[in-house]
Regions:
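Bacterial N-terminal signal peptides that target proteins for export
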Residues: 1-9
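N-terminal signal peptide c-region/cleavage motif recognized by signal peptidases
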Residues: 17-19
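Cleavable N-terminal signal peptides
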Residues: 11-12, 22
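Flexible, solvent-exposed loop/hinge segments and secondary-structure transition points
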Residues: 22-146, 153-157, 161-183
Length: 183
């Protein structure tokens, strides 16, 4: 006995099995974000090894489980910082950059790449400016000191948590970097 399905049934099954395709939106390159967040400043790349202990402290403070990559950190001659990080939105990664003053206050954030189908409103300046002036002493929590965007709740939450992770990194490791004494 041969099974001979109707062509419409085959087309319907094929349509159901297609994955939802998210369109990647690249807003800025790292270099463009550097010029926006720290204009007219020379940046020096300052990669660092993120120890398991530091990674754990950052995770506890932010609830972000995705490991922080220590190879995307820059410092200016005046002590300001430019840090690139990424967090999971709903399903896909969101890459963003944070500018920090020499005292650890956020000077701005920029969304570099957004791959989710929904929630792209997190790239709007009105939402991002909520972070300016905050530091590791602030909650940086959705629905506390950061407002939500309807339809972008997970992206808002995860970016907020990620920004908290960046300011905690500053507080724990960049504010007073270990200096090896010369013998």
């Amino acid at each position: 006995m041969n099974w001979n399905p109707h062509p419409i049934a085959i087309a319907g099954l094929a349509m159901l099995s297609l994955p939802m395709i998210a369109e990647a939106k690249i807003y800025l390159s790292i270099e463009q974000a550097q010029k926006i967040l720290l204009p007219n400043k020379q940046l020096n790349k300052m990669p660092m090894i993120i120890t398991d202990d530091l990674q754990e402290k950052m995770r506890v403070a932010s609830s972000i489980r995705h490991p922080f990559q220590g190879d995307r950190i820059w410092k200016t001659n005046d002590g300001s910082w430019f840090i690139v990080d990424e967090v999971v939105g709903k399903h896909e990664m969101i890459t963003y950059a944070v500018g920090l003053s020499s005292s650890g206050n956020i000077t701005g954030i920029e969304i570099l790449e957004y791959v989710e189908s929904y929630g792209y409103e997190v790239a709007e300046a009105q939402w991002r400016k909520q972070f300016v002036g905050k530091n590791a002493n602030d909650p940086i929590k959705l629905n506390q000191d950061i407002q939500n965007i309807g339809g972008a709740t997970l992206s808002c939450k995860h970016i907020s948590d990620g920004v908290k992770r960046v300011v905690v990194l500053y507080e724990l490791a960049l504010k007073h970097p270990l200096v090896q004494s010369k013998k």
